[in-house]
């Protein structure tokens, strides 16, 4: 082996300095572990050379250049007419609005259908991702909270985020429908992320693929029901997904899909959302199969704890319980900054997450047993060996744990 040259020695020295800085940093919080490890996973997906990740990256190749779009036929939806574009064998619709902008008086409330429109709406570009942990409102998610490269043309985060994307090989026929719920816990992510492009699945499987943006973190899961707010405010993000499934039931036939053959599936936080839907009466009958990919078997937050988190947020904003109406007039940045200060609000996956409200989510999806409401739904569950070690990176003892250490904490 040769002796490193001057440039090689400089690189080695720089790496050593970086490593000393890393080791000198204080231990990460649970929420910081989750964010850091999710960023590392996405970076691995982007940089790794193995075939699986190359295939993930290849899904975005068709978006690498600005195209003169060949339009699809106009599709009539229950909200209004839309038109997408053609992409080889596919017809693609991006940024389809399924809900009214959840702002002002609609903030911290279940979603509402949008006002109908009569002019043809172009569905050729991605809708805004939800405001999320670690990303300032208006910024793109790429390289920020979760390291996920934003898809070309994806706008910055916004409260007005209730959009879906649809890929299909044709507007006639009855294809199986697959609705993808993105990862990132309940606080981060986007259905428009580059690695979630649904084109390859629609091409290879001849299914109609749907990806979803929905409210996240404090805007999706702040439970105000015990403080005079909407009883289901703590489930707003999950109720967004229920509204998506209602949209699929009412409209997917016009996109060549079969509303009687709908599968919900998701990975990591998306898998957790699939599990939550199985305990929600509002979702009953809107899907027919479920796939949980590396979904954490975590319990929903108890109502009492969710209420404590809401009180803490009001305190951080200088508001009292009787001031809930003032939440409507605050900026998204003010609310997000206050939420970031509340250590007690960090759910098991980081950030705010669903709670048992007795209405939208009347019981836990796992405890004490499986919900009877979804007993007839076939479920596929997948895991990877040692996958939970993803969340140990950043722990001061990472790399030193013994099996006894881990089992003693189980």
Where is each model-derived feature located?
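Active-site loop->helix "elbow" adjoining a glycine-rich segment at hydrolase catalytic centers
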Residues: 183, 236-240, 268-271
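Short glycine-enriched nucleophile-adjacent loop
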Residues: 271-283
């Amino acid at each position: 082996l040769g002796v490193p040259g001057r440039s090689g020695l400089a690189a080695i020295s720089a790496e050593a300095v970086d490593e000393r800085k890393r080791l000198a940093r204080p231990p990460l919080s649970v929420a910081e572990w989750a964010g850091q490890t999710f960023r590392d996973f996405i970076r691995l997906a982007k940089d790794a050379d193995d075939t699986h990740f190359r295939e993930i990256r290849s899904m975005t190749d068709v978006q690498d250049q600005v195209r003169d779009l060949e339009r699809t036929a106009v599709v009539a939806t229950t909200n209004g007419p839309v038109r997408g574009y053609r992409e080889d064998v596919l017809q693609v619709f991006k940024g389809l609005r399924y809900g009214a902008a959840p702002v002002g008086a609609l903030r911290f409330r279940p979603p509402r259908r949008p006002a109908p429109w009569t002019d043809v709406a172009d569905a050729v570009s991605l809708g805004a991702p939800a405001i999320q942990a670690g990303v300032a409102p208006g910024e793109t998610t790429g390289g920020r909270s979760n390291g996920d490269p934003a898809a070309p043309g994806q706008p910055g985060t916004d409260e007005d985020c209730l959009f879906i994307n649809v890929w299909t090989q044709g507007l006639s026929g009855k294809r199986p429908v697959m609705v993808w719920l993105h990862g990132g816990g309940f606080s981060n992510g986007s259905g428009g992320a580059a690695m979630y492009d649904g084109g390859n699945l629609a091409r290879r499987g001849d299914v109609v693929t749907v990806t979803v943006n929905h409210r996240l973190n404090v805007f999706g899961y702040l439970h105000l029901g015990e403080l005079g707010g909407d009883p289901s405010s703590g489930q707003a993000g999950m109720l967004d997904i229920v509204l998506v499934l209602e949209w699929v039931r009412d409209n997917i036939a016009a996109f060549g899909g079969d509303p009687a053959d709908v599968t919900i599936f998701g990975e990591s936080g998306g898998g957790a959302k699939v599990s939550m839907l199985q305990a929600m009466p509002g979702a009953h009958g809107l899907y027919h199969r479920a796939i949980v990919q590396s979904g954490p078997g975590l319990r929903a937050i108890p109502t009492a704890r969710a209420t404590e988190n809401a009180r803490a947020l009001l305190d951080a904003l200088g508001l009292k319980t009787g001031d809930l109406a003032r939440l409507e007039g605050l900026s998204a940045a003010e609310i997000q900054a206050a939420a970031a200060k509340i250590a007690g609000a960090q759910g098991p996956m980081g950030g705010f997450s669903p709670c048992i409200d007795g209405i939208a989510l009347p019981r836990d999806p796992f405890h004490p047993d499986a919900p009877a409401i979804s007993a007839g739904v076939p479920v596929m569950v997948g895991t990877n060996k040692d996958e939970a070690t993803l969340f140990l990176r950043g722990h001061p003892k990472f790399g030193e744990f013994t099996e006894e250490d881990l089992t003693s904490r189980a």
